[in-house]
Structure formats: C-alpha cells, structure tokens
Amino acid sequence: MNFLSNSVQKIIDKIGNKKYIKQEDIDNIMQEINPALLKADVDYEVVIKFNELIKQQTLNMEILKGLTPQQQVIKIIQNTLTNILGSQPLPLNLKDNKLNIFMLIGMKGSGKTTVAGKLAYFIYKKKIDKILLIAADYHRPGGIQQLQQIGKNINIEVYTNNDTNDASEVILQGINYAKKNNFQTVIIDTTGFSPEDEISVNNLALIKKNIKPDETFIVVDALGGQRISGKIKQINEKLSFTGVIMTKMDAKTSGGLILSIRYITKLAIRFISSSEQHNDDNFEFFYPERIASRILGMGDLSTLIENIENKIDPKQNAELIDKLFQDNYNYYDLQKHLNLIKKMGSFQKILNFIPGIGNKITNLNILDNNIIVKFEAIIQSMTH
C-alpha cells in the first residue's frame, strides 16, 4: 500500500535545505507524485484535486521552526491524504438492546461472502456472542455453501432455506428467526450484481427498504480499477450506503483506489480486508491517518502495537526473553517464539508497519512465512 514511498524519498532529495518553497519546487514535487498516483489506480479527477490542495499549502510557505523543509512538505502531503481519506474514523453502528442488522452489497467477485464472515468474527471479538449470518446469495453457484463453511469455521450460525431461492423471502425469514431467538446482530450476504444490471440493483433497494438495516456496506475490490468509483457513486443514489469495505488489500496491492472511492463517492471507508483467512489482522478498522502514513511508506506503529497487544501473551513472551538472557534458551523456546511471530500475520505485513522498511523488503525471500514452517520442521526433526 506504500505506493508513494519512493516519491517521498525523491522529494527529500529535491527540496534539500531550501528556506522557501517556490512554484518550481512544487512542480518538481508533483512530477514525482502524479505518475505514482495514476499507476496506483487513483482517478485523474482526484490527482488534479490533490495537486491543487498541495499547491495551496506549499506555495511561498515559510518553513516552521524545528522542521526541515522536507519534513514540512511531507507533513502537508500526509495531512492532505488524510483529509481526502476522511480525517476521522467512523465507528461501527452497534446498538444495545436491539437487533443490529447489517446488509452487505457488492459486485460479483468483490469478496463479499468472505467479508460477511470477517465482519461477523470482528463483531464476535467485541464480546457480542449471538450473531447470525443470513445466506441470500442464490445466484452464485456455491455461494450458500461457502457462507455455511465460513460460519462453521468461525463457529457462527448461518441461516439458510433450501426450499426457496427467493433472496428477499429468505432475508425476512432470517430476521424473524433472529428476533425470536434473541440474536444481537444479523449480517446479510446478498446476491452479487453487475453495475449495468438495474433489475438486481432495484431488487436490493427494495429489500433494503423493507428491512431497514442499521448499516448498508458496499464491498469493493481494491483491484477493481479507476472506473469503479463512478459506478459506485451512481449505485449509491439508489442504495444509500453507510460505508465502504475494501477487499484484497494485501501487502502488494497498491491501494490507490481507496483515494478515488472516498473522494468521488463521498462515502466513508469503514474497513479494509486482506487474505481469505478470518484472522484479526486480515480485517481492519479504517483509520485515515494511519492509512495515509502507510501510503507514504512511513509505517503504522499504532496498528502494529495494537496487533502485538491483542495477539501476544505478554507473560509467555517475557518468560522466553528471560530465558534468552539467562543463556537457557533452547530450540523449543525458539519454536515458541516462531509461533508468536506467526500469530502476527505475514512478515510482509509486519514489516510494512515499520517506518522506512516496507518499501525496501518487498522481494526478499525472508518475507515468505513458509520459512517459519521449515524452521519448525527442522526443530521437530531433531533428537533430544
């Protein structure tokens, strides 16, 4: 996601130790940034606006005391990215003492069904136990079965009805079932659609009108291309989404579409999702400031610290470190440490959180988590 990291380094080199930023300097800065933005699938309209905002803030700017020219320009770029992305995170609308209904809508292949499971698991980790997934994606072969398997994997009930393929009927039945059985949250996996399919969009709008969900999320593939933003803007006029969930945001995905979606549709990005697994680190609450930092290759220490706190047992880690300094550290202790590292997710993702590192280690073989598996196999093959 750090698609501007190389540009940042070139900006630092070009500005040097100048006391004032002139028009020529701004032009040089944008010559570095614009190609990177376009290559990362940022819409041309957004690139133009980004240029305007940067120029407004940097032209004839006096360098503040305590900052270098490079630091101040990069800070302006980071703040501009943050403002485009939304400035403040928007929390999930979870209410007590009522049934929360979340409706997931997405184009075909967006990863909507996988997101349904991830959102359910995310809410479950918030200590909300009674969650119901409603399988209503009847048009995609295997869609119902996929959600059933996901529900089984994360131990969350899935409502289905094999006697009908009417999505609207099944959704209403599922909600009634949830109310009768005191569920706290319902997550509805709807049928995927094509932007040109007005019938499907109208059907989804009718379903939404009937069930009045608390949240209606549009699930968007981060690899969908620049044109997707305009299509979502049009569809939003009928479906009134409350937010966007971006999928396929893996370490090697540029992520530029996030800027386009946010600026063109004016919809808040609520979550970002990566991988098919239902782990905590594969489904993240969206913090605009943190994402802006990642885009610039400046890391994201706040998220890294949260992951460590959530996944690493501090007592176990302290015991292993004590053994290491007491010269009492053996291969079995190493294996325990490797397991702790695996809980954190992929090496690539961990290192991308560290400022100045993510953009320099993309092609290293050490980033392959299979190396941990190999180490473990070697340790387990050893004799006592």
Q: What are the roles of these predicted feature ranges?
A:
Residues F286-H384:
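Extended, compositionally biased non-globular segments
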